[in-house]
């Protein structure tokens, strides 16, 4: 089962990716992890990636596609894989298709921007332990304090409203066009496309995914 997850940051993809991986026994492939692993391994592709990144440039689509092909040929991908954060653009999706990387399901997590802002901006973290709270959805027992240690909770820089809104604008400009692209691919019978209502509680979203994926 080969799956692509689409959706803005904060749409709940990470939570559900974990569930899909466990239930269907497929690994999640993140291009960031893949690049780091390739660089560390010192492979030919890894060396190319390192040179580009050391020069402060963006890794080309061709190189990322080559890494994806190499990664999905590994033993743990024999039953499929889950791609999150790639492809991000239509040229990347085209390049994947040309490279013969076919996908069974494209799942779009649909959540309105304002709810995403609400979800992310309300997060509070206890940095030493990694415990995460939410002022509205999962508040600590004492406002602003960690339940276990009583230490101050903080807001991550990435969770500040201005940053979140900037990331949403980027998502709508770059990645949202993929929704139209994969809808057409599904009409042509090349993949299955499903829109998932990401505003529902986690357990309901999970049940919806089980219905879609079988």
From Swiss-Prot:
UniProt similarity note: Belongs to the adenylate kinase family.
Catalytic activity: AMP + ATP = 2 ADP
Function: Catalyzes the reversible transfer of the terminal phosphate group between ATP and AMP. Plays an important role in cellular energy homeostasis and in adenine nucleotide metabolism.
Residues reported in the UniProt entry to bind AMP: 31, 36, 57-59, 85-88, 92, 156, 167
Annotated spans, LID: 122-159
Cell location: Cytoplasm
Species, as recorded: Escherichia coli (strain K12)
Protein name: Adenylate kinase
GO biological process terms, semicolon-separated: adenine metabolic process; ADP biosynthetic process; AMP salvage; nucleoside diphosphate metabolic process; nucleoside monophosphate metabolic process; purine ribonucleotide interconversion
GO MF assignments: adenylate kinase activity; AMP binding; ATP binding; magnesium ion binding; nucleoside diphosphate kinase activity
Subunit organization: Monomer.
Pathway connected to this protein: Purine metabolism; AMP biosynthesis via salvage pathway; AMP from ADP: step 1/1
Influence of temperature on activity: Optimum temperature is 45 degrees Celsius. Thermostable. Is half-inactivated at 52 degrees Celsius.
Keywords for this protein: Acetylation, ATP-binding, Cytoplasm, Kinase, Nucleotide biosynthesis, Nucleotide-binding, Transferase
Free-text note on domains in this protein's UniProt record: Consists of three domains, a large central CORE domain and two small peripheral domains, NMPbind and LID, which undergo movements during catalysis. The LID domain closes over the site of phosphoryl transfer upon ATP binding. Assembling and dissambling the active center during each catalytic cycle provides an effective means to prevent ATP hydrolysis.
UniProt-annotated stretches for the region NMP: 30-59
Amino acids binding ATP: 10-15, 119, 123, 132-133, 200
GO cellular component, one term: cytosol
């Amino acid at each position: 089962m080969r799956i692509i997850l689409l959706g803005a940051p904060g749409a709940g993809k990470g939570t559900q990716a974990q569930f899909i991986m466990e239930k269907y026994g497929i690994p999640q492939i993140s291009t960031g992890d893949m690049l780091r692993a390739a660089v560390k391994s010192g492979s030919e592709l890894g060396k190319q990636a390192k040179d580009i990144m050391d020069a402060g440039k963006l890794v080309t689509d061709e190189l990322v596609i080559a890494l994806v092909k190499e990664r999905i040929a590994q033993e743990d991908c024999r039953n499929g894989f889950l791609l999150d954060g790639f492809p991000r653009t239509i040229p990347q999706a085209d390049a994947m298709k040309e490279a013969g990387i076919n996908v069974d399901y494209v799942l779009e997590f649909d959540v309105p921007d304002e709810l995403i802002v609400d979800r992310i901006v309300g997060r509070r973290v206890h940095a030493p332990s990694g415990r995460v709270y939410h002022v509205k959805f999962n508040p600590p027992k004492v406002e602003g304090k960690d339940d276990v240690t009583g230490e101050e909770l903080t807001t991550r820089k990435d969770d500040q409203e201005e940053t979140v809104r900037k990331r949403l604008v980027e998502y709508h400009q770059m990645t949202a066009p993929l929704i139209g692209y994969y809808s057409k691919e599904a009409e042509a019978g090349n993949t299955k496309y499903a829109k998932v209502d990401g505003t529902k509680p986690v357990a309901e979203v999970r049940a919806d995914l089980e219905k879609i994926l079988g």
